Structures are given as structure tokens and as C-alpha cells.
Amino acid sequence: MSNTLTPLSIQRVKDGFAKQGWEYDDAGEFAIRSGFVGIGLEISHIEPNVNVVSTVAVDSIGADRYEDVRAWVEQYNYTKAYPTVTALKDVDRGITALGAAYTLPGHWGYTDAQFESHILTGIQGVVAASRDFLAEFAPEVTQRLNEVPQEG
């Protein structure tokens, strides 16, 4: 592992995934998609930052729940340092969804250890926020996710 400060890139993310033995799918030149404990996410390099994002939408959380979800995300953002969560209302589909994002600023370099730690923190934060949202608004989905055997 290098102690040299290195700029951010999607290749560094891929290298970290390979080191951990994690699977991912390429999602274009600057992004990958993966999932952890039933939560899908995308990691992208949008110069100069690396972003870990997820959108969680289930049919059981209707558009009529938007105000409830918005109040929940306001409280979540107030009490958590990361990730940032947003209530999303899709009137056409009749659902309210959650957006969760963690951004690793890229205006300076990171050692390999720092980079891996930040990416892991981002993944853990986005997954935890997504599962907290589901536990609050769609506990039946959380229960089903918990019943699915996890690869390991």
C-alpha cells in the first residue's frame, strides 16, 4: 500500500473492490454498480470527486407519504454527518423514494489507506441510510432483505 497522495479515479475504486473480493458491474467509463446487503448503489468519478449514491424506491411508499419521508430525511440529515439523504417524489409513478449520497472530495490526493477507508465509509453510510429508510417506511422489504442469503 502506497503512502503517496494520489488523485481520485474510478480505477482506484475498482482496485479497492478487487482487493476486497467484491463484485461490480461497469456502468460506463467513469462508474461502477454494486450492491451490499440488498441495497444497490453506484460509485462514480465526476471530476474531481468520487460519489457513492443510491436511490431506494418501493411501490408500498406512495407519493402521499412524501411529507413523512421529507420530515424523516430532515431529521436524518440533522443527526448524521453522512451521507446526505433526500426525499424524492415521483408523481407519475405514484411513489416517494430516498436518494442517498456520499461524496469524497477530490481537490487533494489520498493515500491508498485513506482512499479505501473513505470508500468503505461511503458504502457503509449509504447502505445504512437506505436500510434505515426501509425499516421506517417499508419494514416488510427490510424483512425480505434480511431473509435473503448473503454471499460471503
Task: List PLM regions with ranges.
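Short, highly charged C-terminal tails/helix-capping segments
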Residues: L134-G152
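Long, contiguous binding/interaction regions
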Residues: Q124
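Short, internal acidic amphipathic alpha-helical interface segments
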Residues: V56-A101
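A short acidic/glycine-rich loop-to-helix N-cap element
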Residues: G106-T121
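Charge-rich, low-complexity N-terminal segments
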Residues: M1-I46
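Glycine-rich and polybasic anion-binding loops at the starts of cofactor/ligand-binding domains
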Residues: A100, A128-F133
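A short acidic-to-branched-hydrophobic micro-motif
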Residues: L41-S60
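Generic recognition of long tandem-repeat/solenoid scaffolds
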Residues: E29-G35, V52-V53, L98-A100
